[in-house]
Amino acid sequence: MSITPSNQNITSLLKKESILNALERGIRLDGRKNSDYRPISVTLNYAKKAEGSALVKLGDTMVLAGVKLEEEEPFPDTPNQGNLVVNVELLPLAYETFEPGPPDENAIELARVVDRSLRDSKAVDLSKLVIIPGKKVWTAWVDVYVLDYGGNVLDACTLAAVAALYNTKLPKVEIEGDNVKIIKEEKTDVTPIAYPVVTVTVAKIGKYLVVDPSLDEESIADVKISFSYVQDGRIVGMQKSNFGSLSLQEVDVAESLARSASQKLFEELKKQINM
């Protein structure tokens, strides 16, 4: 049976009431505490043809990130740096309202936040992507595909991108003068990422703040705020979404929840990579 807009509004109201009733009892509908993540798994080298890849499952959300390297000329203003390009695609199979075609504003915003977290944190060492200074560099294309949308896709996208970059080994390069020979079959031990960065999203539902909102929680959230961290606890990015508001006190509480929850993401990365 199709759901009409009026029925959908009733459904949302009933859903919100159930979620709020659970939060009043100190628990969420799926049994988590407000500060808990859903089950997380990270699988490296999932796409064998990519230079590096990672599949991340976060509850019902599933995201695949792949890295491809292309030999290019550097930008004139950064002759001693390679390039980083992040794309996010919300595949039609991931959710019923996602449509084929060019990335929409949601995918573009996701890509922008992931890219900014990697750049502003200096986690990606662009100097490692230099082949010949001023002449040849690598462009690292980080393509992130949302395969199943089960809520809180941003945290999964950042985690997948970071894991895929750790899984990437630069190919061997032989240089004679201005001649460059790329030996893609032989990998070095050099990765383009220096240290990990994670993103933690907190949603405000009524008067409650919850980490890692599920799809149901996300659909009735008043506002979401996301924090990006490096391992030493520095905040390297922050993003607010939805039209609701947060008081300064709520931002402080949300940041405290996010900071604590970030350790769970770092622990999951440690299981797969050397940090």
From Swiss-Prot:
It is found in: Cytoplasm. InterPro entries: ExoRNase_PH_dom1, ExoRNase_PH_dom2, ExoRNase_PH_dom2_sf, Exosome_comp_Rrp42_subfam, PNPase/RNase_PH_dom_sf, Ribosomal_Su5_D2-typ_SF, Rrp42_archaea. Keywords: Cytoplasm, Exosome. Its main location: cytoplasm. The keyword Zinc does not apply. One of its GO terms (molecular function) is mRNA 3'-UTR AU-rich region binding. GO terms for biological process: rRNA catabolic process. One of its GO terms (cellular component) is cytoplasmic exosome (RNase complex). The keyword Translocase does not apply. Belongs to the RNase PH family. Rrp42 subfamily. Component of the archaeal exosome complex. Forms a hexameric ring-like arrangement composed of 3 Rrp41-Rrp42 heterodimers. The hexameric ring associates with a trimer of Rrp4 and/or Csl4 subunits. Non-catalytic component of the exosome, which is a complex involved in RNA degradation. Contributes to the structuring of the Rrp41 active site. This is Exosome complex component Rrp42. It comes from Sulfurisphaera tokodaii (strain DSM 16993 / JCM 10545 / NBRC 100140 / 7).
